[in-house]
């Protein structure tokens, strides 16, 4: 898959650099007001009862702050954050080692929790429900099961695909929170905060322009800010102006709606080659030289969100809003 500046997935380098941009406390976390309010209540109640916070499932599109929220929960509850991911836990023994190393009040963050295999998942059930771990000692007829007590802890699971979680696992989360795309005003605040961390001067109008082109996603907003800052710095400009932001974003092929050249290729292909559809997913994939699964999981969600395409039983259709964006009239017949 081609690397895109508007991808919501983090690169390895970004995962490291994002650490300095992440707020440490819930009060400093911008956006997601309903989730924030509810978490604040649940955490305060748990502290009053001197209990571990109920297990939390954070779900929603990538790049919206699930990892950041997990770190904030650990900080607010006074525990250490232990981080891993679904694909990294290959065997039940791997998970057992992680669980037995936890201290009381720790937060175990499992990213991409939907990718846990079923054998590992079953080890989690008693750990989440009763804070205990069942392990089998020996083999064959002499094998016996031993139950180990675990300290009270909070599991925070993150997923972009909540529907792929098994019912038994999903039902063991006491708190479920969906993270939504951000409003431009919220993203502008995030961009301004990041600019301060970068020691860059950013005009408010430039911050809002970056926000509008960031697909409602903080990770994309921060990535665009870094690149626009590069253009301003090389251009010898003391501050990032609206004019500089627009010019740099055009150079990066990110249009006012946050669409890039791949979006253009997909949408224009539907309009010009198939008269707006309906056209099958496999046909679109062959036309733009991409895998059907990638189109469905990576490219389409934002295009659906802004109302540029529709999914129908007969295939994908380009909407009137899509035609209007490109200044094209739909051909009859």
Swiss-Prot record:
Region (Small ATPAse domain (RuvB-S)): 183-253
Listed Pfam families: AAA_lid_4 (PF17864), RuvB_C (PF05491), RuvB_N (PF05496)
Entry's EC annotation: 3.6.4.-
Region of interest (Large ATPase domain (RuvB-L)), ranges: 1-182
GO biological process, one term: DNA recombination
Keyword Nucleotide-binding: yes
Top-level taxon in the UniProt lineage: Bacteria
Head domain (RuvB-H) as annotated region, ranges: 256-333
Keywords for this protein: ATP-binding, Cytoplasm, DNA damage, DNA recombination, DNA repair, DNA-binding, Hydrolase, Nucleotide-binding
Location, primary (coarse class): cytoplasm
Substrates-to-products reaction catalysed: ATP + H2O = ADP + phosphate + H(+)
Localization annotation: Cytoplasm
Broad EC category: hydrolase
GO molecular function, one term: four-way junction DNA binding
Residues the record lists as binding Mg(2+): 67
One annotated Gene Ontology cellular component of this protein: cytoplasm
InterPro entries linked: AAA+_ATPase, AAA_lid_4, DNA_helicase_Holl-junc_RuvB, P-loop_NTPase, RuvB-like_N, RuvB_C, WH-like_DNA-bd_sf, WH_DNA-bd_sf
Record: residues binding ATP: 21-22, 63, 66-68, 129-131, 172, 182, 219
NCBIfam families according to UniProt: PRK00080.1, ruvB
Note on domains (UniProt): Has 3 domains, the large (RuvB-L) and small ATPase (RuvB-S) domains and the C-terminal head (RuvB-H) domain. The head domain binds DNA, while the ATPase domains jointly bind ATP, ADP or are empty depending on the state of the subunit in the translocation cycle. During a single DNA translocation step the structure of each domain remains the same, but their relative positions change.
UniProt family annotation: Belongs to the RuvB family.
PANTHER family named among the record's database cross-references: HOLLIDAY JUNCTION BRANCH MIGRATION COMPLEX SUBUNIT RUVB, PTHR42848
Subunit structure: Homohexamer. Forms an RuvA(8)-RuvB(12)-Holliday junction (HJ) complex. HJ DNA is sandwiched between 2 RuvA tetramers; dsDNA enters through RuvA and exits via RuvB. An RuvB hexamer assembles on each DNA strand where it exits the tetramer. Each RuvB hexamer is contacted by two RuvA subunits (via domain III) on 2 adjacent RuvB subunits; this complex drives branch migration. In the full resolvosome a probable DNA-RuvA(4)-RuvB(12)-RuvC(2) complex forms which resolves the HJ.
Function in brief: The RuvA-RuvB-RuvC complex processes Holliday junction (HJ) DNA during genetic recombination and DNA repair, while the RuvA-RuvB complex plays an important role in the rescue of blocked DNA replication forks via replication fork reversal (RFR). RuvA specifically binds to HJ cruciform DNA, conferring on it an open structure. The RuvB hexamer acts as an ATP-dependent pump, pulling dsDNA into and through the RuvAB complex. RuvB forms 2 homohexamers on either side of HJ DNA bound by 1 or 2 RuvA tetramers; 4 subunits per hexamer contact DNA at a time.
UniProt name for this protein: Holliday junction branch migration complex subunit RuvB
Species annotation: Shouchella clausii (strain KSM-K16)
């Amino acid at each position: 898959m081609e690397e895109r500046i508007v991808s919501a997935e983090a690169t390895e380098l970004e995962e490291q650099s994002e650490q300095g941009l992440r707020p440490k406390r819930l009060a400093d976390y911008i956006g997601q007001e309903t989730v924030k309010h509810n978490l604040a209540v649940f955490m305060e109640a748990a502290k009053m009862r001197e209990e571990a916070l109920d297990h939390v499932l954070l779900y929603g599109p990538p790049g919206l702050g699930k990892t950041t929220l997990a770190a904030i929960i650990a900080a607010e509850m006074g525990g250490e954050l232990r981080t891993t991911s679904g694909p990294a836990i290959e065997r039940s023994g791997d998970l057992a080692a992680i669980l037995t190393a936890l201290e009381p009040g720790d937060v175990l963050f499992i990213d991409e929790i939907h990718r846990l295999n079923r054998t590992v998942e079953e080890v989690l059930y008693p750990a989440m429900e009763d804070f205990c771990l069942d392990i089998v000692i020996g083999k064959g007829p002499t094998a016996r099961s031993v139950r180990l007590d675990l300290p009270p802890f909070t599991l925070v699971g993150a997923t972009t695909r909540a529907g792929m979680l098994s019912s038994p696992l999903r039902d063991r989360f006491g708190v479920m929170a969906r993270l939504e795309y951000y409003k431009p005003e919220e993203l502008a605040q995030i961009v301004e905060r990041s600019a301060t961390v970068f020691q860059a001067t950013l005009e408010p109008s430039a911050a809002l322009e970056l926000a509008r082109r960031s697909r409602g996603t903080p990770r994309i907003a921060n990535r665009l800010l870094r690149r626009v800052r590069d253009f301003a710095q090389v251009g010898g400009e003391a501050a990032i102006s609206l004019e500089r932001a627009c010019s740099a974003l055009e150079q990066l092929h990110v249009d006012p709606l946050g669409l890039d050249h791949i979006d253009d290729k997909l949408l224009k292909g539907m309009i010009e080659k198939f008269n707006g559809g309906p056209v099958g997913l496999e046909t679109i994939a062959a036309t733009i030289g991409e895998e059907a699964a990638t189109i469905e999981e990576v490219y389409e969600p934002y295009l659906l969100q802004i109302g540029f395409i529709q999914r129908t039983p007969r295939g994908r259709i380009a909407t009137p809003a899509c035609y209007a964006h490109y200044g094209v009239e739909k051909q009859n017949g």
